[in-house]
Amino acid sequence: MSRVAKAPVTVPNGVAVTQNGRQVEVKGTKGTLSFNLHALVELKQEEGKLQLAPVKESKDAWMQAGTARAVLNNLVKGVSEGFERKLQLIGVGYKAAVKGTSINLNLGFSHPIDYSLPEGVTAETPTATEIILKSADKQLLGQVASEIRGYRPPEPYKGKGVRYSDEVVLRKEAKKK
């Protein structure tokens, strides 16, 4: 049985949650997000709290309720506070610059990479080797950060590449003669 589903989701002031059948929509200062509830899960709204419960008592229903509760909590947090992800560019000549809705990346290739940001994600570069991505949608933010990191993932010998700011790169020792 999922213990995650038993905890209610607290809805802060300024966030509105509406349910239309299986579609749940969350509106806040940072935008509007929505998702579809699983058929085994039902949503109950009380003043300032959302409670998810399985329709019937089964292991699968509790698993889906726990997942739906985590997703709903991320939606509420996203539209009220937002999420951010920091990337670091480590390597000689590695640079990033934001131009409108795209990021220009120089990652040691013979050509620069222009990464077009999807709608709902913003980027800023406080320094040439640091990228800060912000979004209300946690899943989309993680996907964008992963795609940027995928152009030049950190290599284990020198640690060069694009990495998350909280990522620890395991270093290998060079081959000895």
Swiss-Prot record:
GO terms for biological process: cytoplasmic translation. Keywords: Ribonucleoprotein, Ribosomal protein, RNA-binding, rRNA-binding. Pfam families: Ribosomal_L6. Belongs to the universal ribosomal protein uL6 family. It comes from Acinetobacter baylyi (strain ATCC 33305 / BD413 / ADP1). One of its GO terms (molecular function) is structural constituent of ribosome. This is Large ribosomal subunit protein uL6. One of its GO terms (cellular component) is cytosolic large ribosomal subunit. This protein binds to the 23S rRNA, and is important in its secondary structure. It is located near the subunit interface in the base of the L7/L12 stalk, and near the tRNA binding site of the peptidyltransferase center. Part of the 50S ribosomal subunit. It comes from the Bacteria. The lineage of its organism: Bacteria, Pseudomonadati, Pseudomonadota, Gammaproteobacteria, Moraxellales. The gene is rplF.
